[in-house]
Amino acid sequence: MTHRRATLCAMASVALVSAAQLGMRWSMSRLPSPVQWLEMQEHAQLDLSALRVVCASITAYALSMLFWLLALRVLPLSRAYSLLSISYALVYTLAATLPFFHETFTVSKTVGVSLIVAGVLTINLRRLPRPSPQDLSHENQRFR
């Protein structure tokens, strides 16, 4: 897998985990405590659309993990891990932008998220050193 494809896998992981967070937040604001779900389902009082979103969010978490594992095969952990921070910025921005979350932008949160994004850019915009041919042959022998 190429570095570019691994970065795309990491970004797919970020998008999926962000969607899962937003889905969980939306669902859980419409559902009772999970320990009450079975009791409420018996009385047909459970919001099934919200429960479906919980299930979809759990699936998104699982897919996110799969993409994350693929990304980690190639990306250095120091760079890959910083990409996860983009999720904080994405969730904050979407939660404050989409009206059904009833979240607001604040100066302190926006400054904090801006610092996170600046940190991710600082870490990831530096070019990675190219591995030498000796490093590549050693790496290939390791997998034989």
UniProtKB/Swiss-Prot annotation:
Residues 25-56, 102-104 are periplasmic. One of its GO terms (cellular component) is plasma membrane. The chain crosses the membrane at residues 7-24, 57-77, 81-101, 105-125. One of its GO terms (molecular function) is carbohydrate derivative transmembrane transporter activity. Its main location: membrane. Pathway: Bacterial outer membrane biogenesis; lipopolysaccharide biosynthesis. One of its GO terms (biological process) is lipid A biosynthetic process. It is a multi-pass membrane protein. InterPro entries: Flippase_ArnF, Small_drug/metabolite_transptr. Translocates 4-amino-4-deoxy-L-arabinose-phosphoundecaprenol (alpha-L-Ara4N-phosphoundecaprenol) from the cytoplasmic to the periplasmic side of the inner membrane. PANTHER family: 4-AMINO-4-DEOXY-L-ARABINOSE-PHOSPHOUNDECAPRENOL FLIPPASE SUBUNIT ARNF-RELATED (PTHR30561:SF9), SMR FAMILY PROTON-DEPENDENT DRUG EFFLUX TRANSPORTER SUGE (PTHR30561). Heterodimer of ArnE and ArnF. This is Probable 4-amino-4-deoxy-L-arabinose-phosphoundecaprenol flippase subunit ArnF. It comes from Pseudomonas syringae pv. syringae (strain B728a).
